[in-house]
Amino acid sequence: MGLSEELFDRAVKVIPGGVNSPVRAYGAIGIAPRFIDRADGCHIYDVDGKEYVDYIDSWGPMILGHNFPEVKESVLKACEKGLSFGCATAIEVEMAEFICDHIPHVDMVRMVNSGTEAVMSAVRVARGFTGKNKIIKFAGCYHGHSDAMLVSAGSGVMTSGVPDSAGVPKGCTEDTMTAVYNDLDSVRALMEQADGQTAAVIVEAVGANMGVVPPKKGFLEGLRKLCDEYGALLIFDEVITGFRLAFGGAAEYFGVTPDLVTYGKIIGAGMPVGAYGGRREIMELVSPVGKVYQAGTLSGNPIAMAAGLTQLKYLYEHQEIYKDLEEKGKRLYGGMEKILAEKNLPYHINHVSSLGSLFFTEQEVVDYTSAKSSDTKAFSEYFKGMLAQGIHMAPSQFEAMFLSVAHTDEIIDQTLEAVRTYFTK
């Protein structure tokens, strides 16, 4: 038994499931999770001393690679002044100004501590601004673990929300309606059903929590038109795509402007940071100046702001990174497609820039239903086979792979050889 197994045995006695976020448990894989000791660049090192090429990137924040020198130095410098003050600081103003100066659709922004908080707050603001209650989300799109967002489609698209977690009263979700991703007709049908009471449509501009599912051509533009037609706000959940696909996120990448946007992951550079922002007339409803209440003891924490602002400034000043990540994505995911073709395997690769997924299904994956057709047992064996070769990916068929600046062509080619080796067995 290795140290990871020993730690997991200890953890399950004092932490539910042995982890502090479910996907870390490797529950779908059937082995003990790797406990990580340190990370650098595109590599992580577990407590047993094993080295892995990492394609999780801490679930997205580490776009510059682990332990990036400028970010680390900014944190150490900020720590010298203290960890938290419970008062306003200069750096949270600098962070907000930087975002508003460089993201055209964000006039005002409020910092929070997670993507979940960002979504929860943005939905509340949308309801406050419109005076309406209904929210439309999409099956397979994850928007954090607030009660109103933990909803499945039930018996069909036209069904009002049914809680997808124990402990969530039906009353918390009855105003949440679930549409089919990439299906504008399903959205229009729900808006008609809501009879003018749709406050907002919230969407992952790139589905990244059912595996990676790109929007079909015209889908996001169609959502924009439907929201305008029915008097609803369009919320882009850019917790994953924000500052990753382009500096302006999916909104810039696809050329579609939301009314509100939520951020997480990259905005904190590995620290617990989220944010939501949008048009001034909407954001001015947020307390203390407006009637929509939202607060947080550690929101705008100076250590987290130092890390996040340093990373955002670096990304803005080096926007060639985004072209580089696009090319890395073509090299990795395109290379995987070639291997599947060589081996005559009917599986599918979806990718958008640095985000990608290998789906163990013969179907083209365009929504949650087609994603669920994947053979999760086959994925589990693939994950274990790649881990044995020193490649660390998300331990779930329904999570994304993330590339970072630190993934070199050489590392990507080594990864492709590992893929080829696995499918040659």
Predicted feature residues:
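Conserved N-terminal phosphate-binding loop of PLP-dependent enzymes in the Aspartate aminotransferase
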Residues: M1-K425
